[in-house]
Amino acid sequence: MGAPLIEDKRWSIDLEKRIQEEHYSDSEIYNQRYAFNPKSGKEIFVVDTPPPYPSGTWHIGAVAQYSMIDVIARSQRLLGKEVYFPWGVDRNGINIEFTVEKNTGRKMKTFERAEFLDLCRDTIEEYTQAMRETAARVGLSCDFDKEYLTDSDEYRGVSQSIFVDLFKRGDIVEDLRPNIYDPVEGTTIADAEVERLRRKSKLIDIRWTTEDGVDVVISTTRPELICACGVVVVHPDDDRYQHLIGKKIVLPVETEGRSKSVEITTHPSVKSEFGSGVLMVCSFGDQNDVAVFRELGLMPFQAIDLEGNMTEVSGPYVGMKVAEARERVIDDLSSANRIVNIIEKEQDVPVSERGKNPVEIILLKEWYVRQTHIQDRMRELIEDMEFHPIRNKQFLLDWMDNISIDWPISRRRWYHTEVPIWYSEDGEKIITPPAGVYVQPWREGPPTGSRVLDRESREDLGSWDDLSSQLGQVIGEEKVFDTWMDSSNSNLYVSGYLSDPELFSKAFPTGIRPQGKEIVRTWLYYTLLKSALLLDSPGFKHVWIDGLGMDPWGRKMSKSLGNGIDANSVLECGAGGRTGSWKIRGPDKVVNLRANKIGSECFRLWKACDAQVGDDFQINPEDIEQKYFGVLTKLFNVARFSSQFDVPSDLEKLPTNLAPEDEWILSEFQLVMQRVEKAWQEIDIYTAAQSLKNFSTGVLASHWLEMVKSRLYDGDNSAAWTLHRMVRDLLDAFSPICPFFSHYLSSTLYERSAVDADSFPTISLNFELDGWTEITESVMIFNSEVWRMKKEQGLSLNTEISDIIVPDNLLALKVPLTRMHKLTD
């Protein structure tokens, strides 16, 4: 016994940052710990880390999720696996284009394309660096030296190769189809990128007239689309309108270049209770219109162009924006005495997820990934994957139930991966690049090694090098991929697809896909679709789907609500003695939240303990500090207390003279460690964290340690061995959650870092556990009762107390309990 080896008297954020900086500053040691070594001979476990999108401040809910993904990676290392935990950044897409447009005050199409791409790349690199710093601050143990960027030539080359492979298989097609289109941003979007926002609208009852003079009221919120009406329908069972079926009805507005009347027929999709029960079907008001046009074989009209303006078919409204045309049509109908009623109402309006602009359905020639034909096979493959929690698998299945059309993957934007296609001068042949080569067809010709394919049959006709002179002036495709077309290749990319066949054979299906529930229908679904189409394989062994980070009242955080909390301010809270203060808007008033110290270790512990995977979690810095910083303090105090006692020379060999109370605590400890090991194996962070927290701060610190302090001070070997063995193993088991805390304490105490442990600590006991573990609750109840009695009598805990009898079931611990509480007869 001597002065504590752990000289720092308390855990602090400054100490945490010092350890972190040492941890990340030595790249050689860092890589020895965390770099992926596929030749180690260990079981390979690949984490398909969600490549975050750098668009300003990293959302605190996402930072919390990534800290738990790191816990998964570290726990699998602790279980002896060779973990590849890549760091990737998703840098393609419309978000950075929006940012550049906002910064410059100019729309994308006013730039030269190359100039705009350079601006996007420079801007996103600034955000990427800030994100790297936050990733390190929250303690991620990624293989940063193997960072991948989805806008790099390497990644884009793989994306383009996958496109070519799917095209050759017939799983990618080019077609003129109705597409969801954002006219403000000038691009097609997929179903999964559509949100519905509550907005005010007008339900207008309009009087139409049949050719034989019968008035019919039709209700609509889109009168500007009357010019694109292809048919009027009623429900086949609606007796009110049986006499109208087969009649021709005249459009109540002027049009250009089309018939002035359409037929009235029946269709089961009509909701008789909506408005008058008579529906105009236009090209295209919604997906039901699309389905009816397709089913009845109607020729669609293009009422809205790519700029969001009305076309010639709209007659006097040509060139107007949609909203303006809507009001003008209402005015003209009113002047013609054809407005029966106008009802102001709120309506769920479909808008683009990123731009929040009302979307239209427009006929466009786009590229599509076929998906409806493979849904049954995908469901079979999904059954081969383990979901955490199992209930969140339903998010995926529910989304798949709604899939009825192919996935449009081409966009009319710029900062994305280009569609890797050139067209021959006659348009009958296409040229595709060699595998892995990134190309930009809008500004360069096909590279050497490209192949020429028949556009319709996809037959390979030969090499570009041999046939180029026969193809005339080739034209490069100007469209690009949807962002998810790139992002959904992440598991293939990190597992070595195309680049390392040997690794891919060992690493795929990928070990785990960790992500939030909000991108199940996009990132998860599209990734699984690719794996099914390309490889007929499940994409992953495990899928971990977490909930969302919410404000203290359970609301989504957003700029409009003013309830966001900056992640870095929480991680830095307490550094340099600076406290944290957050002013956020609550449901009723603005609230000031305050905390003295949090840091990354407390933040990680909070996320691990406070909510089970899949549950939404409320983020309140005050609660994080109050509930969890004290846990670190208590465990730190246990370790520091231990550090004043000599570490036994052999912590692997069980002493022969264990005291009864040591046998009891070791029995309880073994059960806890078995529970934790099982939890890490099952990727159950919550159970592992709660088990370690409860044991460390409960039965160990508050009960056993108080029971044996006098023995420790007397130099008792059994007590010292038991204490050090538990502290050492606890730090190993705890290291996935709080790595820097565990590293510092274990390195100081045992001259080995807990984060370097590559096997879960186990202890072999040569006595029966059951008899001991059965009395644990009784021990805790007895101790609490004695403490309560002393408090009621105004006695300090070190004061003798009489007339307390140790219960019969605790007689094996009578001596240490008597000594602990100073019981007298």
Model-derived features with residue positions:
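NTP-handling and nucleic-acid-processing catalytic cores
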Residues: 14-26, 72, 137, 141-142, ...
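Short, solvent-exposed turn/loop segments enriched in Gly/Ser/Thr/Pro and often Arg
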Residues: 41-42, 50-51, 84-97, 147-155, ...
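Phosphate/diphosphate-binding loops
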Residues: 324-349
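Non-catalytic terminal extensions that flank enzyme cores
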Residues: 1-60, 83, 340, 353, ...
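Feature 926 captures the class I aminoacyl-tRNA synthetase adenylation module centered on the KMSKS loop
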Residues: 2, 205, 403-485, 489, ...
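Glycine- and acidic
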Residues: 4-12, 50-58, 113-117, 142-149, ...
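Active-site-adjacent "gating/activation" loops or surface patches in catalytic cores
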Residues: 257-265, 476-508, 513, 698-705
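N-terminal catalytic cores of NTP/NDP-binding nucleotidyl/phosphoryl-transfer enzymes
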Residues: 38-99, 150, 159, 218-221, ...
